[in-house]
């Protein structure tokens, strides 16, 4: 049976592939942090993503007006800062917890689009799960407060990514992803150089950075920009609730990270 590319099921499939790609790659990224740090890892990831997307999307062919450029630039900046905050977070706290806290972004989008009482009940449950993860009580498992703050900052940027990503996709189509990656890479590169210096360009790091660029940015963000054109922002935010569990499983399988019972309960509250 042929599935239309405009079908909601097609868009959902793209999102699932995107989430799997991002979370498996995040485990790889954590192995690079001890070498060059989160800032340089983010910069290289975005740089390679931009290079990979250039010949595919051919953004120079897009005829954009000044008005169309604004959402693309904001999309690129939110992408860059989101990634750097997220990498700073998971360098300090478990991957699954970091993604769960970052989920405050899509959760906020879902709240803004909710109209029914049942929607607010589910959102309240998710907020309760997030409170369980905050380092304000013994159940949080002694999470690093700086890591938590970075994860929440990444969540804010994720909300901006969804908001501006939909507008960027409408303005420039597939070229928006490539242009956004260029903007994000240019914004984060100074932080990477300041943090790691020339070591970020060593041959032991570049192959890993290329893999991150493809599977953490180029592929998933390309898939997401297509999905965002077909799905309402609220639906996108709800579907992304699967991401914390995928992240936790990736952390367990690839990094040997373990979550306590309260943290698993919190994740369950968030994704329900």
Please annotate each region the language model reported.
Residues 32, 41, 45, 89, ...:
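Hydrophobic/aromatic residues within transmembrane alpha-helices
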Residues 2-4, 46, 205, 241-272:
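C-terminal-most transmembrane helix of multi-pass membrane proteins
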Residues 104, 118-137, 154, 250, ...:
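Hydrophobic transmembrane alpha-helices of multi-pass small-molecule transport proteins
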Residues 1-40, 74-77, 81-85, 127-128, ...:
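Glycine-/small-residue-enriched transmembrane alpha-helix faces in small-molecule transporters
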Residues 11, 35-81, 108-109, 125, ...:
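Transmembrane alpha-helices of multi-pass small-molecule transport proteins
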Residues 1-20, 50-74, 112-121, 139-143, ...:
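Membrane-interface interhelical linkers
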């Amino acid at each position: 049976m042929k599935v239309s590319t405009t079908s909601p099921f097609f868009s959902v499939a793209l999102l699932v592939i995107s989430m799997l790609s991002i979370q498996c790659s995040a485990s790889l990224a954590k192995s690079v942090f001890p070498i060059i740090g989160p800032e340089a890892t983010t910069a290289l990831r975005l740089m390679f993503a931009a290079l990979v997307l250039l010949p595919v999307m051919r953004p120079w062919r897009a005829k954009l007006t000044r008005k169309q450029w604004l959402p693309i630039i904001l999309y690129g900046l939110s992408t860059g800062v989101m990634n750097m905050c997220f990498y700073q977070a998971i360098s300090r706290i478990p991957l699954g917890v970091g993604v769960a806290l970052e989920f405050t972004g899509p959760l906020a989008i879902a709240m803004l689009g909710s109209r029914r009482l049942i929607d607010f009940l589910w959102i309240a449950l998710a907020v309760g799960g997030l409170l369980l993860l905050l380092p304000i009580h013994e159940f949080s498992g002694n999470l690093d407060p700086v890591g938590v703050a970075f994860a929440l900052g990444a969540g804010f940027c994720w909300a901006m990514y969804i908001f501006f990503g939909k507008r960027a996709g409408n303005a420039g189509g597939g070229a928006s992803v490539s242009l956004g990656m260029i903007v994000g890479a240019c914004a984060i590169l100074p932080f990477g150089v300041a943090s790691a210096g020339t070591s970020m360009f060593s041959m032991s790091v570049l192959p890993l950075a290329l893999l991150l660029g493809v599977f953490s940015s180029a592929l998933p963000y390309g898939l997401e920009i297509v999905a965002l054109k077909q799905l309402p922002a609220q639906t996108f935010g709800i579907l992304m609730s699967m991401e914390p569990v995928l992240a936790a499983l990736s952390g367990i399988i690839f990094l040997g990270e373990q979550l306590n019972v309260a943290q698993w309960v919190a994740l369950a509250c968030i994704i329900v």
